[in-house]
A protein has these predicted regions:
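Conserved Radical SAM active-site core
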Residues: 66-200
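Hydrophobic faces of well-ordered beta-strands that scaffold small-molecule active sites
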Residues: 102, 150, 178-180, 201-203, ...
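Alpha-helical scaffolding segments of alpha/beta enzyme cores, especially the outer helices
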Residues: 137-140, 162-173, 189, 193-196, ...
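Conserved glycine-rich "GG(E/T)P / GGGxP" loop and the immediately following alpha-helix
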Residues: 143-170, 212-225, 242-257, 263
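Auxiliary Fe-S-binding modules of radical SAM enzymes
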Residues: 1-52, 247-364
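Short, non-ligating residues that shape and space the ligands of small metal-coordination modules
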Residues: 53-57, 70, 115, 122-123, ...
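Conserved radical SAM core fold
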Residues: 122-123, 157-159, 185-191, 201-217, ...
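Short, cysteine/histidine-rich loop/knuckle motifs that typically chelate Zn2+
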Residues: 46, 60-63, 108-111, 115, ...
Length: 364
């Protein structure tokens, strides 16, 4: 087991940052900073549930374990999924477009989303049944497969916080970038602990309604907004995904509120992806999202001042393409996960519209 990061002691109000084990040792444990300790119980400070965990108990994620007043991450280095993906699959459209990403996923989640498409791993906590992977091997695999980045994805990467920090540090030494595909339910302290380690924060804002979060996901909205704003403050590239579910989060007023919040707090150049819901897990009785609903969301985003809205899970639709927000020229044509930069020109390190010269914000 690997000791969790980030904690303060309630009783002594002391910070501890020492390593309990040497790097590469059998237990590979390191001083933690993400939980508070009091009378044998600990308060996990990694995600916004703030679980109070008694000795011998687990947090809501089922993976962070209190052993004699010390919090451990049982899933450190335990991998369920490894894959080489096109980066557009995340989806990320303004971050290293056209490149390959080495994707890693584990088990567990701090949400209980009724519509989860990866529920087989997200609602599983059997980390001991998975294969082990060291940070060094993960980075080696990414380089070996000619990937430009490593993504923590498929399940909630916050539960892999310590593993992600160790991989991210090594990845940067090899010139690789790093990606968090997250539900955003981290504490702001946890986000700031990722500063300089995570390059792209691809966040799901599942609805702009706290009731939805409580009933459908088992969480709250405000912590997601706070962590997303914190990621911006840390200089991370941000792209937002909103999966639109018929009857649950598809009202025009709610979509407008979401777009206005993103535009005001994250910025008008923030890509936002409205994706089509397909019935899954516990919501198989609902229909797929009508195309018209997605197209309306696209228009609402434009009207709210967002310059780069996209549609997802709708193959062949122009809503997945990138257009110049100034002159409307087609800049990047996408066909599934394949893309071609048909209307971009390079001006030094900057991408510009071939027609009007507008600077297009893309991280290469």
């Amino acid at each position: 087991m690997h000791e969790a990061r980030l904690y303060e002691r309630h009783e002594e109000y002391e910070k501890r940052g020492d390593c309990a084990g040497a790097e590469g040792s059998a237990d590979d444990s390191c001083g933690s900073d993400s939980y508070s300790k009091s009378s044998g119980s600990v308060v996990c400070r990694l995600c916004s549930h703030g679980c109070v965990i008694k000795s011998g108990g687990y947090g809501i994620c089922g993976l962070r374990y209190n052993k004699d007043g010390v919090l451990y991450a049982e899933n450190y280095g335990r991998v369920a999924v490894e894959a080489v993906d096109p980066i557009e699959k995340k989806p990320l459209y303004h971050f290293m477009p056209g490149t390959r990403v080495y994707s890693l996923g584990g088990v567990g989640c701090n949400f209980r989303c009724r519509h989860c498409q990866n529920w087989e791993i997200s609602q599983c906590t059997a980390a001991d049944s998975l294969h082990g992977l060291s940070p060094q091997k993960a980075v080696f695999n990414a380089v070996e497969h000619r990937c430009g980045s490593i993504a923590f994805t498929y399940n909630e990467p916050a539960l892999w916080h310590e593993f992600a920090v160790d991989i991210g540090t090594l990845a940067h030494e090899e010139g690789l970038k790093t990606i968090y595909v997250t539900n955003g339910y981290l504490t702001e302290d946890a986000v700031f602990d990722l500063k300089g380690i995570i390059d792209a924060f691809r966040v799901d804002i599942k609805a702009f309604d706290d009731g939805f979060y409580r009933k459908v996901c088992g969480g709250r909205l405000q912590p997601v907004l706070d962590s997303t704003a914190a990621a911006k403050d840390c200089g991370m590239h941000i792209e937002v995904v909103n999966l639109i579910i018929p009857t649950l989060n598809d009202s025009e007023s709610e979509i407008r509120e979401l777009c206005e919040w993103v535009c005001t707090n994250i910025g008008e150049n923030t890509p936002i992806h409205f994706t089509r819901f397909h019935p899954d897990y516990e919501l198989t009785s609902l229909p797929a999202t009508p195309l018209g609903t997605l197209e309306k969301a696209y228009s609402i985003a434009k009207d709210a001042g967002l310059r780069y809205p996209y549609l997802g899970n709708v193959a062949g639709h122009a809503g997945s393409d990138t257009f110049c927000p100034e002159c409307g020229t087609l800049l990047i044509k996408r066909d599934g996960y394949r893309q071609s930069g048909v209307g971009l020109v390079k001006d030094g390190s900057v991408d510009k519209c071939v027609n009007c010269g507008e600077v297009i914000p893309i991280v290469r």
